[in-house]
């Protein structure tokens, strides 16, 4: 039995049947939904983190690949949490982890898988290398998850007061048809506003009339009520 198999068994021991029944509805894995066919065993994220703490040092990347290619959602999510930990703890070159992450992006195919890994790995790498070309490449792909990966990765930049790449990518996919992009764009704009309300309002004044309503609502959530209403009613 390899380490990946040990992790699968450990996760199975933590499975909660009620969660296994609920997660497919929550993560939209039904027929015709964005995560159609995804399978769940019902392991919560806090329980997955217990597994990560125990196994992140033990499992090599080649076995992590097996876990990340699994049809079971919690296997993939745990694999990504392990990869984040490996990246954060790495004392030498992290290029191998970046290559691994991008080589497996086809399996990073739901919003939680994207959001809980991309900015901590890809975003940090791009910020520290001062090279955002991979984010621009991802934002140009047709795949929904690649586009979301690109914009959410800029969270690392935004939290450090660097807004330009985020604004550029938001505008590139401002009117994407899927609400998961509308929400992601609004979320990142709101994060910018948490650091600089002036930057947020300046951006919104230039573009709010062109953005989806969901994006606007997410972006203005933390503004005072009068300002929110002015944006919603088109008075600015």
Task: Explain the meaning of each model-derived region.
Residues 1-236:
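Alpha-helical scaffold domains
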